[in-house]
């Protein structure tokens, strides 16, 4: 059976699976607090809260002193939380007294299911099966240019579907773009599909060169099960959907076999940063890593899309030690964040993962750089900034296009500088 036919059958299975009803999680009267640990003792208190309570959803990892940590807190848990914070003298700020109301005020605008094949666009977000149908259509309409690829499988049997784009008609240096590994970060897959479309249709000379000079591998959804769950059940879901000891899922961006679970991850299955019981315990990361390994030597630039906070990051996440080619990373970083700023004045910051944002071992970019001879690997944390929206994972649909445009501007500059430095030779 051809890949196209087998994937069509898989898509039918996905549609059937997505139809199973589930009660949607709501956050009525949940509070959103921002706390900041000023010393190691206070940090330990927050870490204990993160590991022991299923009534507090941590939107940020609890890893370093001085970093803001946002917490969504169930109404019945608020008195206990405030007592604990008070005793530890941890400073906090109430940012929302009704998280559900705050979320409802943001117009994400999800497309009506089944309409993607007619007019897929970037004025709205799409469910998984509609995006997969669109990718299938691209492969049919662009023979010899777009090839449907299966980057892996999921616990629930879905395909990690993407496209390979060879606009020149022959193999060129490779760029791999992975998005959506964290399920709730909807802007990441949307931006990935925008880039696919621009590579195929743009008349802008710099974008045409980007399409023609490189072989592209783009996977908009590296965590399909989790993404489906954000549409059917819990908009704030982050992890995979593998069952573990009364809780579900591991953090797929803490599960890669490169300094796995050394720092910046949790061993608690109920934590949003649960690293899994072992490296590559998740079918998603294991199968995707196998696919990437099959491309070893063909990929020179790896890009991972996340949200939010407007960062551009490079290895490492497990240590403050810097890559041996850090001088080149900094050159690429400088031109890339300058480019992202030009169109709309959007400000990105960043640097090496460990120091710029927080320790995070077991990430995909570190694995690609550390084990696959991919000498340039970057992670974008897209819009909004950390202070722009209370629920930063819910970016209004009206911002999909501008966020994606400035990202593409940045990637154009990034690829040019990586080429200037000789990495595509």
UniProtKB/Swiss-Prot annotation:
The keyword Protease applies. Disulfide bonds join 247-270. It is found in: Secreted. PROSITE patterns: CARBOXYPEPT_ZN_1, PEPTIDASE_M14. Zn(2+) binds at residues 182, 185, 306. It comes from the Eukaryota. Keywords: Carboxypeptidase, Disulfide bond, Hydrolase, Metal-binding, Metalloprotease, Protease, Secreted, Signal, Zinc. It holds the Pfam family Peptidase_M14. One of its GO terms (biological process) is proteolysis. SUPFAM superfamilies: Protease propeptides/inhibitors, Zn-dependent exopeptidases. The active site is at 381 (proton donor/acceptor). Residues 124-418 form the Peptidase M14 domain. InterPro entries: M14A-like_propep, M14A_act_pep, Peptidase_M14. Binds 1 zinc ion per subunit. Belongs to the peptidase M14 family. This is Zinc carboxypeptidase A 1.
